[in-house]
Amino acid sequence: MENRRIEAYRPHTLIRDWGQEIFVAETPHYLGKILRMKAGTAGGLQYHVEKDETFYLLSGRALVRSDDGTGQLRVTMMLPGESYHIPPGAVHQVEAIDDCVFVEASTAHYDDRVRCEAQYGLPDTGGLPTTR
């Protein structure tokens, strides 16, 4: 068996309109992040072409919007200790009711985002633009 070494990773933080994205792992295969969202902020309504992600709420309360399969948005309350898997193609948005802290694990498709506000007749909430 080949002898492999572990490597230290230096986390880095990106400031977003909604809070902070702290990268704690970044490899060609996966990303690990801590997301800190400010109360009253939301990410964009979006889906990913290739990115497969799971997020876990450590603290705070959030609303998760998702397409219910009929073209309508469903809103679900997310509480600490709950986790959601977002497969590629699933329309979703997270809105922080309180200050929230999430753990996110995903594939390494960082710039993979298609914004969907217009498709659902909603105003653009700002945030990151479509990359695909």
Model-flagged regions — what are they?
Residues 5-10, 14-15, 72, 95-132:
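Double-stranded beta-helix
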Residues 34, 75-77, 91, 99:
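Well-ordered beta-strand positions in beta-sheet-rich domains
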Residues 50-67:
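Glycine- and acidic-residue-biased ligand/ion/polar-headgroup-sensing regions
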Residues 68-89:
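Short acidic-glycine-tyrosine-enriched beta hairpin
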